[in-house]
Amino acid sequence: MLATLLSARIRGDIAVAAARALFEAGLRDARSMADATWQQRVDALGRGGYRRYDERTSTILGKSAALVLDRYDGDLRRLREEPDPKKALLDIPGIGPTGADIFLRDVQGIWPEFAPYADPKVLDGARRLGLPASPEELGGFVAGRDMPRLADGLVHAALDKHLAEEVLAAAEGR
C-alpha cells in the first residue's frame, strides 16, 4: 500500500500520513481494502492529507487489492515465489518502477533472497558519497537485515546534495 502511495507525484510525508490513515481506518490488508467501499478509501486518504489524487488512488487501491487476492490469495509473501518479483510487482495497479524499487528496497531486510537490492536511486547516492555503485559491494558493508537502512540513507544522499556534503565532511573529520 505504501509503495502505491509513494509512487504518486506527492510528497513522501503525505503518502506516509495517508498510509497511516488507511491503517487507522482498518484498511490493513488486501481483504479489508477490497471489502471497503470506494468512498471509505477516499475518506481515509483525505484524513491523511492525500487529497489531490484521492479518488484515482482509491480506485487503484481497490484494483490492487483484488489482484493481490486473486494472484496471491491476499498474501504478498507469495511474491517470493515469482521468478521476477519486480516484474510481478509492476503488474499490480498503481505500482510503477519507483514503487517496485521502494518495495524491494525495504523488504530485503526480511526476505534475504532479495538482498542486496540497490535500485538506481540507491546507486546514485552511493556514487555521490564515493561508495561502490554495485549492490553486491554495498551489501558487503552491512548485515542483510540492515541493507534497507543503508539503502534508505543512500537515497537521502542522492536526493539531498547538502546532506551528502555533510556526510562526506564528517567522514573526513571536518
Short names for language-model regions:
Residues 1-5, 45, 61, 103, ...:
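Short alpha-helical scaffolding segments that buttress acidic/His motifs in well-ordered protein cores
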Residues 97-174:
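C-terminal accessory module of base-excision DNA glycosylases/AP lyases that mediates lesion recognition
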Residues 3-14, 51:
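A short secondary-structure junction motif
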Residues 8-10, 26-27, 69, 130, ...:
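Short alpha-helix boundary/capping elements
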Residues 16-26:
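A positional/architectural concept
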Residues 11-16, 31-34, 54-58, 97, ...:
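Alpha-helix N-cap/helix-initiation sites
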Residues 10, 51-56, 141-149:
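Structural motif
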Residues 25-93:
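Alpha-helical ds-nucleic-acid-binding substructure associated with the helix-hairpin-helix region
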